[in-house]
């Protein structure tokens, strides 16, 4: 029986010998490869924190001592040690184990959001709460890495943590030099310098021993070289980077030596007061396919062959790949086009552009706020920046979008990947807020393509507009192409109009279908017609602002249905309601959109079905709306 099979709580690892811990670490890595390869998930980050997580749970007393994992995609080992190994077959599945920490799963999990750079602020607040409640013996551990320290929020938190000299906050910097791809920026360079220090000091120590063995001449030579060494070291190695904030610093420590990490953490626990433990780890450690994945070290994978690391099944081209190719084409013809990524060039489709135009791709780290205002600066300088981020991360840069881009009416194109429902990535990764968030920026235009050809057209149009634009598309494979019957002057397209054979008295329904849900609407049009209604389907293409042609069409129908994969409050449907009211058009409207909830993780199709936005759900809601207005007889 393996050691892992005996682990059901953190207490079980506290009594193990270091030899047993090494065996357990190997067993955990084998377990992770087996389970994550079958479900998909964040494999590389978790392979890199096995010994670190073991040491944390041996030194601290979870859940009394909160352990906060920044982004928490590297919390799989933590889940294993807190009794959840048996649920890993359900990882990221409906009603199964979350891919991030989850308060519903365990009292060992204190947070749930998977947005980066927030852990230190949580830790600061928890430590203050414990201090005010007189719970001085409790520690707070924040594990931050995978590029999260490139986010400004971490430094805002550190500035506050450092002032709490009587608050027990241990900040573990999990330094693997990566986010998705290699971490960039001045802070990353500083950590690299700190990583360099131990070997540098070992060489100097050897030199000291040799020179002193030569008598007084050697001693004088050593003194001169020592003074030179200190001057060089202070200029290239930022040893005061953390102490200058008022925090004790320990490290770098080999993150794959459990004994060494444990010793550093015990010192941090007993130190009393804020402290940094700098741990150097290798993302993907122990699994050759991950170690050989130079680009991302298997940061996140789908279902893979555990022996080879290769994806299982054939992967069809997705939305991101179409955008990626179109951006490169645009860059070839226009030298003013530049691109910005917040540490996610690969996932957002910017890598190809960066390879072709390395001087025109700017990776700003996990810093969406800075990315947006930097884009504003590029636009002020006469360029047309394309900011490519996940839809859910646009929320982090709203003030910059509103005041630094919108207020100046600058030609910045924001491309939102993973817009709408994403599903298995969990509540905080769904991109359902972008219409409501970006839509209130005066003068902004938001495009929602329905297929690949539509995406190409709309992205090209966005690059010709001298004001802020957004192009949003979902995660996953592309739907079949849908041709339009007519394009109106404002860009909206008529996709379906019921046959003229129907009698004039037949009830008529206008369906405004947005983006990725257009194909779902078209799938059920004939079913609605068979129930006895004429149906008109229009795709606005540019969903914001509301196209005048849609307002005009609404006046000619007895019921308007809007269908979108964004939040219902403040979404496209709500904007159409306002436009109709402003034009004094009195027609019933039903908005089919994502409800105001944080949903549990499940597949995209499962989630769409759960909220009534699958083809079946859309059909049911349209028929119910028509029946409620007596446009159809109730069966």
Swiss-Prot record:
Broad enzyme group: transferase
Entry binding sites for thiamine diphosphate: 73, 114-116, 147-148, 176, 287, 368
Pathway(s) this gene product operates in, as recorded in its UniProt entry: Metabolic intermediate biosynthesis; 1-deoxy-D-xylulose 5-phosphate biosynthesis; 1-deoxy-D-xylulose 5-phosphate from D-glyceraldehyde 3-phosphate and pyruvate: step 1/1
A molecular-function term among this protein's GO annotations: magnesium ion binding
Keyword Metal-binding: yes
Cofactor binding notes: Binds 1 Mg(2+) ion per subunit. Binds 1 thiamine pyrophosphate per subunit.
Keyword line: Isoprene biosynthesis, Magnesium, Metal-binding, Thiamine biosynthesis, Thiamine pyrophosphate, Transferase
Chemical reaction(s) catalysed: D-glyceraldehyde 3-phosphate + pyruvate + H(+) = 1-deoxy-D-xylulose 5-phosphate + CO2
Keyword Manganese attributed: no
PROSITE patterns recorded: TRANSKETOLASE_1 (PS00801), TRANSKETOLASE_2 (PS00802)
Physiological role: Catalyzes the acyloin condensation reaction between C atoms 2 and 3 of pyruvate and glyceraldehyde 3-phosphate to yield 1-deoxy-D-xylulose-5-phosphate (DXP).
Family stated for the protein in its record: Belongs to the transketolase family. DXPS subfamily.
Protein name (Swiss-Prot/TrEMBL): 1-deoxy-D-xylulose-5-phosphate synthase
């Amino acid at each position: 029986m393996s050691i892992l099979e005996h682990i059901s709580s953190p207490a079980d690892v506290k009594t193990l010998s270091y030899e047993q811990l090494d065996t357990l670490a190997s067993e955990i890595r084998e377990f992770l490869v087996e389970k994550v390869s079958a479900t998909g998930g964040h494999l590389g980050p978790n392979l890199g924190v096995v010994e670190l997580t073991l040491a944390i749970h041996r030194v601290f007393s979870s859940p009394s001592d909160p352990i906060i994992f920044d982004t928490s995609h590297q919390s799989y080992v933590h889940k294993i040690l807190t009794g959840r190994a048996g649920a890993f077959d359900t990882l990221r599945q409906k009603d199964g184990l979350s891919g991030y920490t989850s308060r519903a799963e365990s009292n060992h999990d204190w947070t749930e959001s998977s947005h980066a750079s927030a852990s230190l602020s949580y830790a600061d607040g928890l430590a203050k709460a414990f201090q005010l409640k007189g719970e001085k013996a409790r520690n707070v551990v924040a594990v931050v890495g995978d590029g999260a320290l490139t986010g400004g929020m971490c430094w805002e938190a550190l500035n506050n943590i450092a002032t709490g000299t009587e608050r027990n906050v241990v900040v573990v910097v999990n330094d693997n030099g990566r986010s998705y791809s290699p971490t960039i920026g001045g802070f990353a360079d500083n950590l690299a310098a700190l990583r360099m220090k131990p070997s540098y000091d070992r060489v100097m120590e050897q030199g000291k021993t040799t020179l002193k063995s030569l008598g007084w001449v050697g001693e004088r030579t050593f003194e001169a070289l020592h003074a030179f060494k200190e001057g060089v070291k202070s200029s290239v190695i930022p040893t005061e980077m953390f102490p200058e904030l008022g925090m004790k610093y320990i490290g770098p420590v080999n993150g794959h030596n459990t004994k060494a990490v444990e010793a550093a953490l015990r010192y941090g626990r007993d130190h009393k007061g804020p402290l940094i433990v700098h741990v150097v780890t290798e993302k993907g450690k122990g699994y050759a396919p991950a170690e050989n994945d130079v680009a991302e070290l298997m940061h996140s994978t789908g279902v893979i062959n555990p022996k080879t690391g290769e994806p299982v099944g054939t992967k069809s081209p997705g939305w991101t790949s179409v955008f990626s190719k179109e951006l490169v084409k645009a860059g070839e013809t226009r030298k003013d086009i530049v691109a910005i990524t917040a540490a996610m060039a690969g996932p957002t489709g910017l890598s190809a552009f960066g390879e072709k135009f390395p001087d025109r791709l700017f990776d700003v780290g996990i810093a969406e706020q800075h990315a947006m205002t930097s884009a504003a600066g590029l636009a002020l300088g006469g360029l047309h920046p394309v900011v490519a981020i996940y839809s859910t991360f646009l929320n982090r840069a709203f003030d910059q979008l509103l005041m630094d881009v919108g207020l100046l009416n600058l030609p910045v194109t924001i491309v939102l990947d993973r817009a709408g429902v994403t599903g298995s990535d969990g509540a905080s990764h769904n991109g359902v807020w972008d219409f409501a968030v970006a839509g209130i920026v005066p003068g902004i235009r938001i495009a929602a393509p329905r297929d690949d050809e539509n995406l190409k057209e709309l992205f090209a149009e966005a690059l010709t507009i001298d004001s802020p634009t957004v192009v949003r598309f979902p995660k996953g494979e592309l739907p079949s192409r849908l041709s339009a019957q007519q394009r109106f002057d404002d860009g909206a397209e008529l996709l379906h109009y019921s046959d003229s054979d129907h009698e004039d008295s037949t009830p008529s329904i206008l369906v405004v279908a947005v983006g990725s849900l257009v194909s779902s609407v078209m799938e059920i049009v004939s079913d609605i017609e068979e129930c006895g209604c004429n149906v008109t389907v229009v795709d606005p293409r540019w969903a914001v602002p509301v196209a005048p042609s849609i307002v005009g069409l609404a006046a000619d129908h007895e019921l308007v249905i809007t269908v979108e994969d964004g939040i219902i409050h403040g979404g496209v449907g709500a904007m159409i309601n306002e436009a109709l009211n402003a034009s004094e058009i009195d027609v019933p409207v039903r908005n089919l959109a994502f409800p105001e909830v944080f949903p549990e993780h499940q597949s995209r199709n499962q989630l769409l079905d759960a909220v009534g936005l699958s083809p079946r759900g859309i059909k049911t809601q349209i028929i119910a709306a028509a029946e409620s207005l007596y446009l159809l007889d109730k069966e």
